[in-house]
């Protein structure tokens, strides 16, 4: 089921879905054993700073269980209340989850619905089909701020001493990504699709892990 459905998903390449589900749950092997009701109730009452957020998630979870005719006591996930293969929070379920297998239910613990829901999440966050994600840079730019929220013109990055290892297509701007590889830093041009991956988890290293894991799995399948 992991890849045969992707013909129906022209928006998002299979390797991104494989990367997301791989990083989140090791392809379904680690989806969490905490009762979601307990997790969200505990966080709602014991963490005042985020009580409003988790109370809203708890309400949405209970509405989800009712609409899907699930017993809320049976559903298990992460300590933070994230659910299923893609570790959706209840609010993400409400906004982005889809019934991809057409059985009349949205089930985030079903791999088919999970694949469709991850794809829809990316579609709604602006993924551009066929576009680049990131391009490695030659050179170092220690004087520039880095991170997926930065924005530089290609000429600014060139003036700082960076050169892309492949053409950037029509992109005239990029974020400057810096990865610690132990022996030093590796710089990358981050493009809009990379930023879209960070909408799933707001971390440069997370997004790079998702992308590179997906590519590695894709390449391994081709060998």
Task: Explain the meaning of each model-derived region.
Residues 2-9:
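Short, small-residue-biased leader/transition segments that mark boundaries at the very start
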Residues 8, 26, 43-51, 75-82, ...:
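Second-shell loop/turn segments in exported
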Residues 13-28, 61-66, 118-119:
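Short, functionally critical alpha-helical segments immediately adjacent to catalytic or ligand/cofactor-binding
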Residues 24-28, 82, 128, 140, ...:
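Solvent-exposed loop/turn segments at secondary-structure junctions
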Residues 25-35, 46-51, 67-73, 87, ...:
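Secretory-pathway/luminal and periplasmic proteins that interact with or process carbohydrate-rich
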Residues 37-65, 99-101:
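Acidic, His- and aromatic-enriched active-site or binding-groove loops in soluble protein domains
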Residues 72-182:
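Flexible, glycine-rich surface segments
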Residues 168-223:
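C-terminal functional modules
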